């Protein structure tokens, strides 16, 4: 996105960072507000319908992004894209209700791994297309891939309920936020998803900016894409491994280990002066944080009954979208001042997540009220 902003006429590095943050935040900001609404509609009328809505919107809006002529138009297109977002939490909800209870983390891990693999392949493929055919062509290719996914979804997917029968429309009562918050540790899971996504999206913005500031490096797009892709592969491995370990090791313990190890490594990226060092550190961070979203959603699946997971995962996705929206804004503002400072901030956020997990997980509500008073 920073490279496209520059192509659209923004040349000042500080303004590139700021616009990149605003554009990256636009879609999740809208999606975060509407995600719970679509989650409740999915529980009531079927998750397949919501998945179709999301992909169909992506096909049109992403193609339009390849046609914009100003950074303001791109920002508006990203806002409109938020009206069709919510694909990932719906896919997570489908996976959580389709798998046996003891295999829910593995099912969620598979969905998350597919998403991470798209992050791995996307920047490298997008960098190649952008280098040889222009950045606009990358948007058209992405829209075409979404169209293929839409056809496959319509033709091949049959939605089932947790009992294994077809989902009757209009069968589920809506789950409101105040009801979701009554589930033990629901708010903590929401916070962990926010933190995990905040860190991931922040690094996705910082890597291209960091590489662009490295002296003597010309292939900025290709190098940035390679670093992001390799880190995403590491995160995919971590997600799969964490999902399988969760069948024998408590999920909060796995999350704690990842956050405590990944925080200092994230801050250490501030010391990277060349792309090889940045690549190694980003890969290690991916190994530590790759399973965070998977494990947090698996915790959510343990907390919420299957018939309400569409709405519940919509509310949990609010944490993801808030993290996705606020991270580019915060990281863009910090990077405009100091890129190393932004890395350190991400590392501190990871340690805050570990502290929240250590203090709040499993504590009775009465004990928490006593601790606050």
Feature annotation, model-predicted:
Residues 28-36, 86, 119-120, 232-240, ...:
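Residue-level signature of mid-helix packing/kink "hotspots" within the transmembrane helices
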Residues 49-64, 143, 253-267:
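Structural signature of the two symmetry-related core transmembrane helices
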Residues 1-3, 7, 183-200, 283:
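Pair of pore-lining "gating" transmembrane helices in MFS-fold secondary transporters
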Residues 158-189, 373:
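Juxtamembrane intracellular "pre-TM" segments in multi-pass secondary transporters
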Residues 137-155, 342-359:
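Symmetry-related core transmembrane helices of the 12-TM Major Facilitator Superfamily/SLC fold
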């Amino acid at each position: 996105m920073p490279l496209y902003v520059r192509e659209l006429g923004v040349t000042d590095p500080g303004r590139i960072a700021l616009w990149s943050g605003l554009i990256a935040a636009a879609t999740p900001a809208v999606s975060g507000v509407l995600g719970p609404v679509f989650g409740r509609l999915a529980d009531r009328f079927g998750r397949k319908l919501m998945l179709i809505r999301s992909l169909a919107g992506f096909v049109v809006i992403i193609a339009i992004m390849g046609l914009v002529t100003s950074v303001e138009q791109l920002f508006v297109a990203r806002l409109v894209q938020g009206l069709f977002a919510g694909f990932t939490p719906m896919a997570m909800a489908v996976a959580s209700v389709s798998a046996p209870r003891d295999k829910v983390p593995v099912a969620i891990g598979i969905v998350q791994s597919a998403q991470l693999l798209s992050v791995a392949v996307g920047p490298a493929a997008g960098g190649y297309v952008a280098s040889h055919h222009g950045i606009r062509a990358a948007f058209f290719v992405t829209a075409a891939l979404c169209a293929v996914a839409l056809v496959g979804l319509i033709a091949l997917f049959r939605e089932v309920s947790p009992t294994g029968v077809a989902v009757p429309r209009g069968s589920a009562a809506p789950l409101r936020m105040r009801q979701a918050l009554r589930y033990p540790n629901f708010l903590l899971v929401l916070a962990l998803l926010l933190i995990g996504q905040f860190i991931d999206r922040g690094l996705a913005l910082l890597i291209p900016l960091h590489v662009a500031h490295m002296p003597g490096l010309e292939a900025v797009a290709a190098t940035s894409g390679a670093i992001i892709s390799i880190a995403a592969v590491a995160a995919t491995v971590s997600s799969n491994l964490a999902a399988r370990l969760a069948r024998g090791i408590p999920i909060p313990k796995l999350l704690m280990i990842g956050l405590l190890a990944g925080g200092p490594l994230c801050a250490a990226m501030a010391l990277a002066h060349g792309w090889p060092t940045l690549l190694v550190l980003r890969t290690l961070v991916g190994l530590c944080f790759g399973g965070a979203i998977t494990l947090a959603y698996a915790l959510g699946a343990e907390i919420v009954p299957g018939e309400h997971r569409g709405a519940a995962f919509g509310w949990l996705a609010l944490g993801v979208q808030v993290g996705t929206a606020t991270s580019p804004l915060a990281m863009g503002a910090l990077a405009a001042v100091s890129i190393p400072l932004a890395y350190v901030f991400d590392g501190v956020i990871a340690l805050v997540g570990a502290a929240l997990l250590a203090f709040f997980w499993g504590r009775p509500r009465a004990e928490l009220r006593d601790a606050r008073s």
